A protein has these predicted regions:
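Conserved short acidic donor-positioning loop in nucleotide-sugar-dependent glycosyltransferases
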Residues: 15, 27, 43-44, 113
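Catalytic core of nucleotide-sugar-dependent glycosyltransferases
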Residues: 174, 225, 229-233, 238-269, ...
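Conserved nucleotide-sugar donor-binding catalytic segment
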Residues: 141, 160-244
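A conserved acidic beta->alpha catalytic loop
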Residues: 42-52, 80, 112
Length: 361
């Protein structure tokens, strides 16, 4: 058997044994005409996941279960407590990094254990598209979003923009401003020479993975929606509520700039409306807020003036004055369509950091 995979299928899990089985059934059922590997990274599961994976590996080793072109099924464990996580996203990022570090394929895809695929040829179709477009770093499909417990036909295609032409080539501004999709719907050309562990560590989450690889080429679109994205009440996006939701979304693009400064101007342009919305909400509350301990703990670890301010629920009088000033500046930028992002970013983070970024890219 050829031990050099062309495709690495990467799965992360945490106490999802039964859902993992559904996920693996759909993955191992893929009809691929190239060698591929499946790698499962398990973060601290105590629900029998290890035993389930050992049994599945034995079935494959003993030829009780034969999967055409499968080179190996790897099961690896990690403990996200090791990275001193401040939120669920950092735990996921640590798990994603662990599974990514085991990948050997020319291409890779991510899939979460609580999701699955609804066709048996989607990965081959994406792979063919990337082989035909060597200039592209990723091939993007859409996802099919469905609520937990509901039939697939009750779901809907996401994102909800109008359908793109099949094989359309997208450039970074398209992805960041218009068509950004779930990371799991991308097949990505792996860049093994880049040390993602040292660059991102526990911050190697879905969005950072997408943005990192966007730096290496354009994106080709496949007009399919075969990744089933199941929505649960405990999903990360569902647990962010109230002022945490407002502030974290308001500062999201600043987080992206911290790790992917190549697209700093695009991020500021995209995030300006969320920054303005955040300041509007704060102004209505008299610049008082009540963030969860989790969010405050994460902000204390993040460099920059605005993060320091939100690390505590009680702001200093001079910080309130600056917050009001920054709000006026942001509104001014929006009203007159200004693009001197270096100044606004310097106000929000610090001038030294702003001066290190090439804002003309």
């Amino acid at each position: 058997m050829n031990n050099e995979p062309i495709l690495s299928i990467l799965i992360i899990t945490h106490n999802q044994r039964d859902l993992l089985k559904r996920c693996l059934d759909s993955v191992l059922g893929q009809k691929l005409n190239v060698p591929f590997e499946v790698i499962v990274s398990d973060d601290r599961s105590d629900d029998g996941t290890a035993e389930f994976m050992a049994d599945l590996q034995n079935q494959i080793t003993n030829d009780q279960l034969q999967i055409t072109n499968l080179t190996q099924l790897v099961y690896t464990r990690c403990n996200s407590n090791d990275c001193d996580p401040k939120n669920v996203s950092e735990r996921c990022g640590w798990n994603k990094l662990n599974v990514y570090n085991h990948a050997r394929g020319k291409y890779f895809v991510n899939i979460d254990a609580d999701d699955f695929l609804r066709s048996d040829d989607i990965y081959q179709s994406q792979l063919d598209m990337l082989e035909a477009h060597q200039e592209c770093s990723m091939c993007m499909q859409d996802v099919w979003q469905v609520n937990d417990g509901e039939p697939i036909e009750n779901g809907f295609r996401w994102p909800s923009y109008g359908r793109l032409e099949n094989e359309k080539i997208l450039v970074p501004i398209d992805i960041i401003d218009k068509y950004r999709a779930l990371n799991q719907c991308y097949m990505i050309r792996r860049q093994p020479e880049v040390d993602c562990a040292s660059l991102y560590g526990k911050h190697f989450d879905d969005t950072i993975i997408t943005l990192h690889h966007l730096q290496f080429g354009t994106v080709v679109y496949l007009n399919r929606a075969d990744y089933i994205w199941v929505q649960y009440k405990t999903s990360i996006t569902k647990t962010l509520q109230g002022e945490d939701n407002i502030v974290e979304y308001g500062l999201l693009q600043l987080h992206h700039i911290r790790f992917i400064p190549s697209y700093a101007s695009l991020f500021m342009h995209e995030g300006l409306k969320d920054i303005i919305h955040m300041f509007k909400e704060l102004d209505m509350k008299g610049y008082h807020w009540q963030l969860t301990d989790r969010t405050q703990a994460a902000f204390r670890k993040t460099p920059g003036w605005i993060y320091r301010v939100f690390s505590y629920n009680q702001s200093k009088w001079y910080d309130r004055i600056k917050l009001k000033y920054v709000r006026l500046v942001a509104l001014f930028y929006s009203r007159f369509k200004l693009t001197n992002w270096k100044y606004l970013y310097g106000l929000l983070i610090d001038r030294k950091s702003a001066s290190k970024i090439d804002w003309n890219r």
